Design a protein with these regions (language model features):
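Generic, ordered loop/turn and secondary-structure boundary motif
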Residues: 49, 76, 85, 91-97, ...
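Canonical Radical SAM [4Fe-4S] cluster-binding loop centered on the CxxxCxxC motif
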Residues: 81, 85-121
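Short, well-ordered coil loops that connect the C-terminus of an alpha-helix to the N-terminus
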Residues: 44, 81-82, 98, 165, ...
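Flexible, acidic/Gly-rich N-terminal and inter-domain linker regions that tether
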Residues: 1-90
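Generic detection of intrinsically disordered/low-complexity segments and helix-coil linkers/edges
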Residues: 6, 18, 96-99, 201
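Core AdoMet radical
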Residues: 107-123, 128-229
C-alpha cells in the first residue's frame, strides 16, 4: 500500500504508483490548462505533487517549457541568491565488496589497482584542491571493511585540520554506503555538511539486476537509509 510517510521501502516506493504517474504525465504532456495550473502553484511556492512534477517533466509545449525554465531560475535566485555552490570529489578508496554492474570498482574487477589513501596522502590531496580554489569537498569511498566508519571519521578530521595559505576546507560532504543510525550520528558529530547516497533506481526488479551481490544488493536497507540518517 502506497504511503509516502512510511519508513518502509515497500510502502513509500510503490512500483504501481510510479508506472501510473508516468502514464498520467505522458497523457497530459499537451494539457495546457493543467500545466499552467501546476506552474502557478509552483510560482506561489505552494509545493507540487509527484504527479504534477512528472507532468512538468513530460511537458511538450515549447512556450510553457520556456516559462518553466524562467520560473525555475527565479525560484532558485529567490531561495539561494545569484550564486552556484560547487564541490570537488575526493576519492579516499576504491576498495569495494559490492557487485554493481555499472561501476568499475565492483569486487570482481581483478584488473583494477586498488588503493586506499593514507591520512598524509589525504592531506596532500586537500592542499592540491585548495590550490585550485575549492572550499567544499565530497568525500567518496567504496563499501569495504577497510573503509570503516573509523577510517572515514579520521579522514574527515584530517581534512578539516588542513590549514593552507590562511584557508581551510569549510564543508565536507560525505558519499559512502548506507549505514546505521549510530554511524550517521557519528558523521553528524564530525561536522559533515551533507550526506549523499545515490539510488540508481527505485524499481526493485531493476535494482536487483544492477546490484546482484554485496551489501548494496539489500534494496530495503539501502532505500530506507535516508530515514535512518
Amino acid at each position: 500500500m502506497y504511503d509516502v510517510k512510511s519508513k518502509v521501502a515497500e510502502e513509500f516506493i510503490d512500483d504501481g504508483e510510479i508506472v501510473e504517474t508516468m502514464e498520467y504525465a505522458r497523457a497530459n504532456r499537451h494539457n495546457r490548462a493543467l500545466i499552467e495550473h501546476i506552474l502557478d502553484k509552483a510560482e506561489a511556492a505552494k509545493g507540487i505533487t509527484h504527479r504534477e512534477a512528472a507532468v512538468l517533466l513530460e511537458c511538450d509545449l515549447p512556450d510553457l517549457n520556456e516559462r518553466m525554465f524562467a520560473l525555475a531560475r527565479r525560484l532558485k535566485e529567490r531561495i539561494y541568491g545569484n550564486r552556484i555552490v560547487m564541490f570537488a570529489p575526493l576519492y579516499l578508496s576504491n576498495y569495494c565488496i559490492n557487485g554493481c554492474t555499472y561501476c568499475p570498482y565492483h569486487a570482481k574487477n581483478k584488473t583494477m589497482l586498488r588503493k586506499q589513501l593514507s591520512q598524509k596522502e589525504i592531506e596532500t590531496e586537500v592542499i592540491a584542491l585548495q590550490d585550485m580554489g575549492h572550499k567544499r569537498l565530497a568525500l567518496e569511498a567504496g563499501e569495504h571493511p577497510l573503509n570503516s566508519i573509523e577510517y572515514i571519521l579520521e579522514s574527515i578530521r584530517t581534512i578539516y585540520n588542513v590549514k593552507h595559505k590562511n584557508g581551510a576546507i569549510r564543508r565536507v560532504n560525505v558519499n559512502i554506503a548506507a549505514t546505521t543510525v549510530e554511524n550517521y550520528r557519528k558523521l553528524a558529530e564530525a561536522g559533515i555538511g551533507t550526506y549523499i547516497l545515490f539510488q540508481e533506481t527505485y524499481n526493485k526488479e531493476n535494482y536487483q539486476k544492477l546490484h546482484p551481490y554485496g551489501p548494496k544488493s539489500n534494496y530495503a536497507y539501502h532505500t530506507e537509509a535516508m530515514d535512518r540518517a
